[in-house]
């Protein structure tokens, strides 16, 4: 998406011979175009892949996000749950405690298959299940046997329409993706978030460790239901009444506009914005609103792309419980700047990573107070659990109840993730867990 929209803008600019742009600006645009082409991966194919005479069909798209009905009297609902509810998060299954040898992969797969409904019910009740000590999941084929034995239904990465997350085995249409293992991102603390892009969100995910980092690199999880309960009622009320929206992309490469005659700057900005908007909205399956700003990168002019307004709390589609479904911890530029003081700069150094910089606002585009941002950060971090995974360990999580993230690390880290559109027996689980008497 980014490469297409940016190059379209530059192509349009090059045809505007009425505007005088100095050679430095032209070189800057050309350099960025080459950089973006080099650093932006080609989206994965949606055609079947033929490998060793076996046709691999691509998984289906991630399902549409289930926003549900509005929650009336959100603060009253919070107080009722706070008075009556105590969550256990996560559930844990230790292979050794089952009486199964760590290297007996056949017995491990048999256990997973025979207890699939119980494990999936734990995922729904507890929000996440941590499985430890299973040799079965130490490699990709075994990991795929694991989630197939559970009856999980794989889907494409929700980023599919806008970029390409690398796959673990490097093959197109592979269902197991890299989980942000790049050495260049080791100083980047990945804030807590639910996985969704635009209109699509997986129902569940399984994160697996194929190789643990020498230092750090813990997988982070937090219970969205507990975050909802722990929020200050006034902050909760403000957020829910005004909704939220994300800035999902920034194009900070338009300094050259300052070198255009003043009378032509506004018309040129209109042309750029119109071309970029048309290109981006033709690529993604959600509406993107572009707006001009300054100061994102060393005072540079930028185009900021904002997604539609959405609620920060939703009712869980299976159990009906209210849960925090908001990525402020990972998307807020202010919170990321605060973390830079602890972990160092995020290293937004190249074209692709700069474009991927994000932020969050109220749904009416108002700025969120620093005090409210820091309160949300404190509540989130209070609920974060650092899961140090060893080879073969898996965290099976419900994407609506469980937020996830990743700690900084040193060394070589090889974690993978599979996304799921649903699972076998979902309606049966829903009938046993959903209560019409929920507040």
Indicate residue ranges for each PLM-predicted region.
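N-terminal chloroplast transit peptides
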Residues: 1-25
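Basic polycationic patches enriched in arginine
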Residues: 3, 27-29, 34
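N-terminal mitochondrial targeting presequences
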Residues: 18, 33-44
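Active-site environment of non-heme Fe oxygenases that use a 2-His-1-carboxylate facial triad
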Residues: 43-111, 116-118, 122-125, 183-191, ...
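Short, conserved acidic/polar surface loops in the N-terminal third of protein domains
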Residues: 142-144, 169-176, 200-203, 217-220
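A gly/proline- and charged-residue-enriched helix-loop-helix capping module
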Residues: 155-189, 194
């Amino acid at each position: 998406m980014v490469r297409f929209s940016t190059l379209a803008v530059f192509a349009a600019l090059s045809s505007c011979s009425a505007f005088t742009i100095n050679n430095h600006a032209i070189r800057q645009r050309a350099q960025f175009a080459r950089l973006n082409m080099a650093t932006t991966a080609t989206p994965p194919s949606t055609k079947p892949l033929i490998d060793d005479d076996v046709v691999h069909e691509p998984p289906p798209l991630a399902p549409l996000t289930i926003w549900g009905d509005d929650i009336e009297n959100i603060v009253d609902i919070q107080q009722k749950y706070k008075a009556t509810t105590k969550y256990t998060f996560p559930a844990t299954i230790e292979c050794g405690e089952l009486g199964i040898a760590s290297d007996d992969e056949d017995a491990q797969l048999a256990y997973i298959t025979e207890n699939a409904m119980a494990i999936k019910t734990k995922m729904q009740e507890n929000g996440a299940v941590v499985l430890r000590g299973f040799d079965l999941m130490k490699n990709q084929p075994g990991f795929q046997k694991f989630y197939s034995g559970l009856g999980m239904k794989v889907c494409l990465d929700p980023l599919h329409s806008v970029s390409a997350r690398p796959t673990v085995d490097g093959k197109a249409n592979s269902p197991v993706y890299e989980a942000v293992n790049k050495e260049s991102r080791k100083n980047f603390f990945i804030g807590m978030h639910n996985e969704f892009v635009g209109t699509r969100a997986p129902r569940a995910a399984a994160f697996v460790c194929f190789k643990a980092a020498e230092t750090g690199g813990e997988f982070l999880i937090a219970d969205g239901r507990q975050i909802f309960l722990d929020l200050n009622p006034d902050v909760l009320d403000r957020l829910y009444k005004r909704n939220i929206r994300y800035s999902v992309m920034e194009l900070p490469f338009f300094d050259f506009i300052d070198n255009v005659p003043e009378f032509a700057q506004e018309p040129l900005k209109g042309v750029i914005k119109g071309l970029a908007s048309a290109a981006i909205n033709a690529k993604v399956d959600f509406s993107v609103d572009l707006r001009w700003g300054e100061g994102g990168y060393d005072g540079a002019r930028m185009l900021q792309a904002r997604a539609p307004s959405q609620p920060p709390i939703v009712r869980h589609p299976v159990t009906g419980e209210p849960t925090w479904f908001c990525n402020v911890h990972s998307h807020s530029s202010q919170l990321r700047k605060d973390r830079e003081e602890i972990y160092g700069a995020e290293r937004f150094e190249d074209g692709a990573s700069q474009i991927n910089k994000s932020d969050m606002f109220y749904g009416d585009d108002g700025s969120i107070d620093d005090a409210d941002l820091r309160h949300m950060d404190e509540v989130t971090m209070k609920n974060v659990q650092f899961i140090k995974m060893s080879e073969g360990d898996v965290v099976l999580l419900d994407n609506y109840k469980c937020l996830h993230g990743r700690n900084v690390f040193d060394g070589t880290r090889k974690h993978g993730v599979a996304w799921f559109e649903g699972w076998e027996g979902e309606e049966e689980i829903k009938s046993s867990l959903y209560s019409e008497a929920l507040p």
